[in-house]
Amino acid sequence: MMTEKSNGVKSSPANNHNHHPPPSIKANGKDDHRAGSRPQSVAADDDTSPELQRLAEMDTPRRGRGGFQRIVRLVGVIRDWANKNFREEEPRPDSFLERFRGPELQTVTTHQGDDKGGKDGEGKGTKKKFELFVLDPAGDWYYRWLFVIAMPVLYNWCLLVARACFSDLQRNYFVVWLVLDYFSDTVYIADLIIRLRTGFLEQGLLVKDPKKLRDNYIHTLQFKLDVASIIPTDLIYFAVGIHSPEVRFNRLLHFARMFEFFDRTETRTSYPNIFRISNLVLYILVIIHWNACIYYVISKSIGFGVDTWVYPNITDPEYGYLAREYIYCLYWSTLTLTTIGETPPPVKDEEYLFVIFDFLIGVLIFATIVGNVGSMISNMNATRAEFQAKIDAVKHYMQFRKVSKDMEAKVIKWFDYLWTNKKTVDEREVLKNLPAKLRAEIAINVHLSTLKKVRIFQDCEAGLLVELVLKLRPQVFSPGDYICRKGDIGKEMYIIKEGKLAVVADDGVTQYALLSAGSCFGEISILNIKGSKMGNRRTANIRSLGYSDLFCLSKDDLMEAVTEYPDAKKVLEERGREILMKEGLLDENEVAASMEVDVQEKLEQLETNMDTLYTRFARLLAEYTGAQQKLKQRITVLETKMKQNHEDDYLSDGINTPEPTAAE
């Protein structure tokens, strides 16, 4: 069986009765199976038909002994087949992105202090273990934790205040509140620990040093608020009783985590305007809820039913149960803060002060709603308004120039197609605020699959690839539009992203070929390859059947890009010649003639360069000879002066020497 697989010969089920069991599958353990079946498993990854063949062999009834062996073999085959099918394939790295991005940047962390000696080895190991528990504030796990901590914060901000104001709510469900309270306390404490293990960026690098993380958090105001929010004020229950949830108001100080969750959600969501509106509505509902609770407390302190402004007497069955109490107060708070309804007028001074305060808050809420909602709606409709302005301008121009109705309808349909398919975004305008590196990376991610289909660009340099993807321009053609006509000078190449194009005859009806998404044409004509039988003219009529999205690369942009990459230009031209040669569109005689002309031009250029070098060399030699002669003359003059000075010194010494006296 193994020999047949390696030779590519598949045995028939009829012949399988004479085969022995594969030696790689044994009943005595996993090691023998792994050791003996390594080549077989590699071969089995290519095709599942041998496995199915072996399964069919297992089903074939046999006579005699060996039933247990057959069961073991069947189990082994099924296990191998399942492992092979459920094995995750590693994604093949894309060479285009690898050439552009280069090697991935490894995670760099900053540490405090220098470790020395063998004693430090254990410290490093411990530090590595601690680093495993450092959360990246930009990661998904940190965001999930923000969602977890936002829930108890919102619970305390809503229900803790309501329980403190509505005593029936606290007394009827106090067991549930105890469980939720201490669960939220546990989450608060866990959040304090996680904040101590949350990294931060320092010069763009994620800091994971425990001491730095601790110091960075402890010296902030948020740390003081977090500690204050977990102070065990519940101990006051022993003095005032368990039905006094107001002693837990310090839990409201943990509000920053909820706001942080909202901010991160706004940056992550694909619908930021809708989230902002929802967030604003939530804030308004919380304010109305708090105001309703405060109204109930004020009514309780003044006395229920004392006057028309306070809450009615709870002895009345209609107003004496919890649901009616809260709904009535919420209704009163909504009418007061929104100033859209009539409420009973206040009677006492404290009632007047509270209503005045509520009216001021209501005005601020109304202004906030109008401002924020108006701004959000304007932002949501900004793209449509801009697009509609373009359509109106085109309509006005066509009416002014008295364009035919058919052409006007065609233009309107083209605009409708752009809006329906969300193709109104100007890529240059959207990406202009990004640095060049990020723009290039976005462009290569967006246009990568398209650019890879162009034959001449498959092996180009990474730098040239970046230049090219930045120069690709999207174009949309309407049904019946000619992308190019036979005999036109080719100044652009096109890559089909969506739609279908037809290669048609001169009559525009007869179709020779159909081009679909992924096809490209015109890439050879923009290279100006010598010897091409096509030259730089189009050889066919190409027409759009429906609305077609194409990417265009102009000849000028390509030449501008390859100016800085002469080697890449040679590679592109050589690859273009190979393609033309395979398709029989290269005139070898003309190529040879052009090569001879090129050689002759190179020889002439070389002779000119040699003459120039000879002239420069002769000039340098003359300058050298003249400089050497001048140097010799200066040396001769200096020697003469030195000799003259030496003689003068000798004579002066002889004159100044006194004659010896007779006594001496």
UniProtKB/Swiss-Prot annotation:
Chain residue ranges for the region called Ion conduction pathway: 272-380
Classification via InterPro entries: CLZ_dom, CNG_cation_channel, cNMP-bd_CS, cNMP-bd_dom, cNMP-bd_dom_sf, Ion_trans_dom, K_chnl_volt-dep_EAG/ELK/ERG, RmlC-like_jellyroll
Residues annotated as binding 3',5'-cyclic GMP: 522, 525, 538-539
SMART domains, alphabetized: cNMP (SM00100)
One of the Pfam families matching this protein, by short name: Ion_trans
Selectivity filter as annotated region, ranges: 339-342
Coiled coil segments of this chain: 599-653
Keyword terms, alphabetized: Calcium, Calcium channel, Calcium transport, Calmodulin-binding, cAMP, cAMP-binding, Cell membrane, Cell projection, cGMP, cGMP-binding, Coiled coil, Ion channel, Ion transport, Ligand-gated ion channel, Membrane, Nucleotide-binding, Olfaction, Sensory transduction, Transmembrane, Transmembrane helix, Transport
Topological type in the membrane: Multi-pass membrane protein
Catalytic activity: Ca(2+)(in) = Ca(2+)(out); Na(+)(in) = Na(+)(out); K(+)(in) = K(+)(out); NH4(+)(in) = NH4(+)(out)
One of the record's GO molecular function terms: cGMP binding
Superkingdom assignment: Eukaryota
Regulation of catalytic or functional activity: The channel activity is inhibited by L-cis diltiazem.
Residue ranges, annotated region (Cyclic nucleotide-binding domain): 462-582
Compartment(s): Cell projection, Cilium membrane
GO CC annotation terms, alphabetical: ciliary membrane; intracellular cyclic nucleotide activated cation channel complex; non-motile cilium membrane; perikaryon; plasma membrane
GO biological process: calcium ion transport; membrane depolarization; monoatomic cation transmembrane transport; potassium ion transport; sensory perception of smell; sodium ion transport
Tissue specificity of this protein: Olfactory neurons. Widely expressed in brain, enriched in deep cerebellar nuclei, olfactory bulb mitral cells and cerebellar Purkinje neurons. Expressed in olfactory sensory cilia (at protein level).
Function: Pore-forming subunit of the olfactory cyclic nucleotide-gated channel. Operates in the cilia of olfactory sensory neurons where chemical stimulation of the odorant is converted to an electrical signal. Mediates odorant-induced cAMP-dependent Ca(2+) influx triggering neuron depolarization. The rise of intracellular Ca(2+) levels potentiates the olfactory response by activating Ca(2+)-dependent Cl(-) channels, but it also serves as a negative feedback signal to desensitize the channel for rapid adaptation to odorants.
Swiss-Prot/TrEMBL domain comment: The C-terminal coiled-coil domain mediates trimerization of CNGA subunits.
Assembly: The olfactory cyclic nucleotide-gated channel is an heterotetramer composed of CNGA2, CNGA4 and CNGB1b subunits with 2:1:1 stoichiometry.
Listed name of the protein: Cyclic nucleotide-gated channel alpha-2
Native species: Rattus norvegicus (Rat)
